Amino acid sequence: MKVLALRHSVAQVYADTQTYLHDDSKDEYENAFLISNLTTHNILYLNYSLKTLKILNKSGIAAVEVQSPDELFALIRCNFTYDYENNIIYLHDYSYYTNNEIRTDQHWITKTDIIDYLLPGWKLTYVGYNGKNTRGHYNFSFSCQNAATDDDIIIEYIYSNELDFQNFLLRKIKERMTTSLPIARLSNRVFRDKLFPSIVNIYKKVINVGPRNESMFTFLNFPTIKQFSNGAYIVKHTIKLKQEKWLGKRVSQFDIGQYKNMLNVVTTIYYYYNLYHSKPIIYMLGSAPSYWIHDIKQYSDFTFETWDPLDTPYSTIHHKELFFDKDVNKLKDNSVLYIDIRTDRKNMDWKEWRKVVEQQTVNNLNIAYKYLSTGKAKVCCVKLTAMDLELPITAKLLHHPTTEVRSEFYAILDAWDIITIKRFIPKGVFYAFINNITTENVFIQPPFKLKASPTDYIVALYALSNDFNSRQDVINLINKQKQSLITVRMNNTFKDEPKVNFKNIYDWTFLPTDFELKDSIITSYDGCLGMFGLSISLSSKPTGNNHLFIINGTDKYYKLDQYANHMGISRRSHQIRFSESATSYSGYIFRDLSNNNFNLIGTNVENSVSGHVYNALIYYRYNYAFDLKRWIYLHSIGKVTVEGGRYYEHAPIELIYACRSAKEFAILQDDLTVLRYANEIEGYINKVYSITYADDPNYFIGIKFNSIPYEYDVKVPHLTLGVLFISDNMIHDVVTVLKKMKTELFKTEISTSYTYMLSDNIYVANASGVLSTYFKLYNMFYRNHITFGQSRMFIPHITLSFSNKQTVRIESTRLKINSIYLRKIKGETVFDMSE
């Protein structure tokens, strides 16, 4: 949902939009809670409070002040990510398609012939990093840029087996127009750009697990972050390949040689980072034109020193000349060298050309070896061709996508490679490598071992759920790692499936109850965003590839109502109850009936079950931003601090009742996942609370009334306000609690309206208005370690007779309390108090 704050109402009516007028009788937190549970996507918030907007944003719900009709129109028609700390909005708005336009934030693409393969009459526009060049389009009170681009389509095409780009583009645009927006993927770059600077500023040692190409620019500014990926393809791995011949396959209709060179250099930079943890100088031989340097400099400041007879417009220092073996001593330490020298073929015969290429390969290798043999902190990426060749067995082989699969590939070498064993590799094996293997990631660091690292902060986004990891090892890592942000695939199946298919692999699934954590928050993507200064206008869908975000060692753990809080906890319930259910009271009715409480009079105001816990369980797929386990735990240890809102402290038994209702709901819905989740949450409640039951009671608390509007034949009709199991020396403690509660007890508005047979030969009258007081009394006794209440549901009633009687109904009648007393069962009254 998105909340657009206005000072004045608007005349125009928008679809899926609701107006909320700030309620001055309630505080900012209560207003935020009410807004968060509205069911439309767009909320126009009138007479708004800035504090309420802040509360919503910290909860991950985008809430923005809107000052003009243009701002309102821009925000209501699309989704966006909001940097609420810096007041920047990143639109995810593809309406530019109506300009016959596709967009890119990679400059090199604009220098290709891609324009020849677009849809007829369409153009390509460069919009800069995260669309920052579009800021001039929006003259708004907040900074605004459109981060939507078609780079995802272009990159997917490059790695696909399809050649016809126009058909591919058309199909993908049609898919985009007919499917829901993948908001998490679109906002992820904004999130990473907020996340990693904040972590690096706090923690000296940061580990990042499983980065992919979409993060290749993000980490250029963080050479000290230790990356873990799937490892490199090295020369000794070629032993498994059978020899093949030249293939000559076209990969892309437009020229992607620039992309290949950029990937080679970025791969080399990250390889260098992992060895030396600092930024290198970047030397490039055969560099022209290297338009992609502009892309890298948009993200991070590097020194590029280049050699080529042709211009390299974006390099820092360019030598418009050839580079020779004798020039190697010009290259400094703390650097990487990219050798991409290749003479143009022109009209040369292919056999003669082949000799030239092979000689250049030897020359390139000689330059690489000479560069690495002296000095320190050096890495080289060198262009090679398929030929009979000796290479170090530890050399890293690269084959990033290029326009045509021909004979070229690349190798990354370091100082250790040149002194290790070399192996002779025949030309046919290199062709097998080129023909069959595409390097899909610029991160070629070794795989991460699933072990906790006490001094490091571990980030693992979408990286550990794959079933080639041990599920238990993943759980152990999360349980033991003190400081981390780790995601795992959420189990949102209905059959409680332990693993689910994702693309061509399987992922393990997890529920919050799989982990045993303290000082940790388990939330959704939106809930996590709120903790890092961002909010989002579109929540994750309840089904599909969703993840739990687990933040260990956060200073926000005790800020229960600020982060990963209960905002939106009833939203799905409202959507169902006020649309397709039998009555808007359906949730209340079901919760009471499923706990054998058949008195439904006033069920919507006097319910016997925690609605928070019930909704958090049965609709967890919709509201898992709320960290239920944390909420339960902080209540159990009495460490709940709230800034505002209507706060009601649940008795632990209310939480148990909620789990029982949720389990019955799950059985009726055939939802095995909710069934297990509710069972495990009930087990967790019993673990963190020390709940004892007076199932064999010896005392009870009774309420005597001035008069009863029914006929009765018992000596003194009374309401049993609860039973206890105590020793005689605890009577004083019980009396102390009753005295503390005296005012509230006598203010309880108890009423009755019918009689019924509680069981055979037990004729009773109902008593409404009791439960709230009962649960408060329960909490008082619980905190004083006094066993109060039974394991079965407390059903307030007044016993009238121990024989079968005809039931009657009357107008609801208020009962005046005469006295409240503590009495031993089958014994004497030990305490009595009147108002």
UniProtKB/Swiss-Prot annotation:
InterPro entries: VP3_Rotav
2'-O-methyltransferase activity: annotated span: 246-428
Catalytic residues in the record: 718 (for 2'-5'-phosphodiesterase activity), 720 (for 2'-5'-phosphodiesterase activity), 797 (for 2'-5'-phosphodiesterase activity), 799 (for 2'-5'-phosphodiesterase activity)
Spans annotated as N7-methyltransferase activity: 171-245, 429-555
Region of interest (2'-5'-phosphodiesterase activity), ranges: 693-835
Entry keywords, A to Z: GTP-binding, Host-virus interaction, Hydrolase, Inhibition of host innate immune response by virus, Methyltransferase, mRNA capping, mRNA processing, Multifunctional enzyme, Nucleotide-binding, Nucleotidyltransferase, RNA-binding, S-adenosyl-L-methionine, Transferase, Viral immunoevasion, Virion
Annotated GO CC locations: viral nucleocapsid
GO molecular function term, any single one: oligoribonucleotidase activity
Region (GTase/RTPase activity): 556-692
Reactions listed under catalytic activity: a 5'-end diphospho-ribonucleoside in mRNA + GTP + H(+) = a 5'-end (5'-triphosphoguanosine)-ribonucleoside in mRNA + diphosphate; a 5'-end (5'-triphosphoguanosine)-ribonucleoside in mRNA + S-adenosyl-L-methionine = a 5'-end (N(7)-methyl 5'-triphosphoguanosine)-ribonucleoside in mRNA + S-adenosyl-L-homocysteine; 5'-triphosphoadenylyl-(2'->5')-adenylyl-(2'->5')-adenosine + 2 H2O = 2 AMP + ATP + 2 H(+)
EC number(s) given by UniProt: 3.1.4.-, 2.7.7.50, 2.1.1.56
Biological processes, Gene Ontology terms: defense response to virus; symbiont-mediated suppression of host innate immune response; viral process
UniProt remark on domains: Contains a bipartite N7-methyltransferase domain, a 2'-O-methyltransferase domain and a GTase/RTPase domain. The C-terminus contains a phosphodiesterase domain that degrades the 5'-triphosphorylated, 2'-5' linked adenylate oligomers produced by the host cell in response to IFN stimulation.
Name used for this protein in its record: Protein VP3
Organism of derivation: Rotavirus A (strain RVA/Human/United States/P/1974/G3P1A[8]) (RV-A)
